[in-house]
Amino acid sequence: MYIYNVTINVEESIHNQWLQWMKNEHIPAMLKTGKFLNALMSKVNVNEEMGGITYSVQYKTPDQATLKQYYEEDAKKMRAQSKPFEGKFVAFRTELEIVDEQE
């Protein structure tokens, strides 16, 4: 299993609108690609020097091949959906391999 982690720092001026868009539109659209099993959105408890509010969104995917398929088939379109917020956030993405999971 893999996690596609997207960490986003959002300017406070658009925070509420962006958060609603993420929860009601973007994350559901990501799941509808069929490449991810679930999504977990967390607020990062950190005071950024640059300001803003930081979130981590973790999308679980079964394997690296599925994640590669997402990059090839869906990533460009999904990232373009954030155009209304352009210049008001920064994001970086990491791939995590799950080595152990317990409940």
Model-based region annotation:
Residues 1-7, 35-42, 77-86:
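Short N-terminal helix-initiation segments at or just after the protein's N-terminus
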Residues 12-17, 65:
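A generic structural signal for alpha-helix starts
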Residues 3-9, 42-73:
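Short, well-ordered beta-strand segments in beta-rich or mixed alpha/beta enzyme
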